């Protein structure tokens, strides 16, 4: 019974504090273009306050963005490709 109560309390909190992945956009609604992953990691972590980032399909893809950050709307196929690409 205690486990069920704990589950019911923790589950909504996890959704609130969850983070998202995607192409973070600036005030003009454009994602930064790139050729190098190092540039994207700096762009994502220092400008958009994400956990990390890399260059995926010529745009900076960020991991661990806050829920209030705007991201570029992309297809599910492209999102799953960038989510599963291995980062060194």
From Swiss-Prot:
One Pfam family named in its UniProt record: Toxin_3
Taxonomic source organism: Androctonus australis (Sahara scorpion)
Alphabetized UniProt keyword annotations: Disulfide bond, Ion channel impairing toxin, Neurotoxin, Secreted, Signal, Toxin, Voltage-gated sodium channel impairing toxin
Coiled coil: none
Listed SUPFAM superfamilies: Scorpion toxin-like
Name of the protein this chain belongs to: Beta-insect excitatory toxin 1
Entries under Gene3D superfamilies matching the protein: Knottin, scorpion toxin-like
Family membership: Belongs to the long (4 C-C) scorpion toxin superfamily. Sodium channel inhibitor family. Beta subfamily.
Taxonomic lineage: Eukaryota, Metazoa, Ecdysozoa, Arthropoda, Chelicerata
Biological function: Excitatory insect beta-toxins induce a spastic paralysis. They bind voltage-independently at site-4 of sodium channels (Nav) and shift the voltage of activation toward more negative potentials thereby affecting sodium channel activation and promoting spontaneous and repetitive firing. This toxin is active only on insects.
One function term, GO molecular function aspect: sodium channel inhibitor activity
InterPro entries: LCN-type_CS_alpha_beta_dom, Scorpion_toxin-like, Scorpion_toxin-like_sf, Scorpion_toxinL/defensin
Domain note: Has the structural arrangement of an alpha-helix connected to antiparallel beta-sheets by disulfide bonds (CS-alpha/beta).
Applications: Could be used to reinforce the natural insecticidal ability of baculoviruses. The insertion of the gene coding for AaHIT causes a higher killing speed of insects by the baculovirus (particularly against lepidopterans).
Domain annotation LCN-type CS-alpha/beta: ranges: 20-83
UniProt-listed SMART domains: Knot1
GO cellular component terms attached to this protein's record: extracellular region
GO terms, biological process: defense response
Free-text tissue specificity from the UniProt record: Expressed by the venom gland.
Annotated signal peptide: 1-18
